[in-house]
Amino acid sequence: ELVSNASDALDKLR
């Protein structure tokens, strides 16, 4: 779950 959240955050920043 944490990994998924981090990936989402990075995608949003990108």
Swiss-Prot record:
Keywords: ATP-binding, Chaperone, Nucleotide-binding, Stress response. It comes from the Eukaryota. The keyword Transcription regulation does not apply. GO terms for molecular function: ATP binding. The keyword ATP-binding applies. Belongs to the heat shock protein 90 family. Molecular chaperone. Has ATPase activity. This is Putative heat shock protein 1. It comes from Pseudotsuga menziesii (Douglas-fir).
